[in-house]
Amino acid sequence: MVNVDTKLLVIFVELLSKRNATYVAEKMHMTAPAVSHSLGRLREIFDDPLFIRVPHGLTPTPKALELGPKVREMLDLWAAINEGDIATFDPLEAAGTFNISFAGTLGDALFDRFLLRVKRLAPGLQVRLTESSSWEADVAAMRSNELDLAFSPFPTRHPEIVEEVVTSFNMWVCARKDHPVLKDHCSLDQYLECEHIFIAQGNPGTRAAPSLIPLDYALQQRGLKRHSTMTVHAWRTQAEVAAQTDMIFTVNSLMKDLVCETYNLNAFPLPSELETVLGLNMLWHRSRNTHPMLVWARNLFKQVVAEYTGKASIAPMHPPMLTDDSGKSGKTGKGDAEKEDESRLSV
């Protein structure tokens, strides 16, 4: 039986993820020769080259790809042993900082409610909610334990990230109450006739998103396109402009009621030809899959979503999705996800 240093396995996982020894050395605060020495030791242990040098880094051997999920599972189990049991987690005794990031296009109403619940149940936690600047920044922050949970309309399929689609929802069209075109419904022709206020998407390409969001893709398939007049940074600006002009905007159902009540707007279902279902993706780093506080927080978020959307419960249909290093999706053993929905956000 070979005695393997846990740090060697961590280096193996990082090499499998980054495929660049220099990046791994920087992340783990090691020298490049030290990483090379560790790789040599791993090759001896597993009797395989594991990684082949190529012009732009390393490429894993079939043996390395086969070992990847097993080594990750072993490290996750070891982390769970060190972290303790969720059954013994007491939110009243919890301390530290709880960091959450969300894509601005989702709106903040649901997350504000979630944070209030966290503070009520775990008063000792410092809670920090920020709007995501980029997907790369979120992954880097989760990797360094500076970000606990992230929420996005886009699935990631990133090898380091566990993702769960918590719920799905539809899109609505918002306009001022005395709008000259949208009076009691919104047809496709009316939708295209109006000028639209878009919300800035940031860089969707970094989130494995298509070049067009589903709503605009559906229009393109028909040879159609929305008339974009203005692009703003937040839903509040969309609503303020729409309340004073004939411009309209499209919002998800989680935000619809708040938007309409606050700014005295009407909301109409998206034209049936363009009906788009969205997914709310909850994301976390796989190294913290069994962290007691985060397991508690994820379950609490799903409870808040169930209350907010009017559902009695959110029944798991599929477990959270893990992406292995070959690019295929797999599933973790303790699922707490609703039906997986790979829809992206439409605005």
Swiss-Prot record:
Residues 316-347 are annotated as: Disordered. Changing N264S: In strain: ACH0158. Changing V347A: In strain: AW1 and ACH0158. Gene3D superfamilies: Periplasmic binding protein-like II (3.40.190.10), Winged helix-like DNA-binding domain superfamily/Winged helix DNA-binding domain (1.10.10.10). This is HTH-type transcriptional regulator PhcA. Regulates the transcription of one or more of the genes involved in virulence. Residues 1-61 form the HTH lysR-type domain. It comes from the Bacteria. Residues 21-40 bind DNA. Changing I100V: In strain: AW1 and ACH0158. Changing H185R: In strain: AW1. GO terms for molecular function: DNA-binding transcription activator activity; transcription cis-regulatory region binding. Transmembrane segments: none annotated. Signal peptide: none annotated. One of its GO terms (cellular component) is protein-DNA complex. Belongs to the LysR transcriptional regulatory family. Residues 325-347 have a biased composition (Basic and acidic residues). InterPro entries: LysR-type_TF, LysR_subst-bd, Tscrpt_reg_HTH_LysR, WH-like_DNA-bd_sf, WH_DNA-bd_sf. Keywords: DNA-binding, Transcription, Transcription regulation, Virulence.
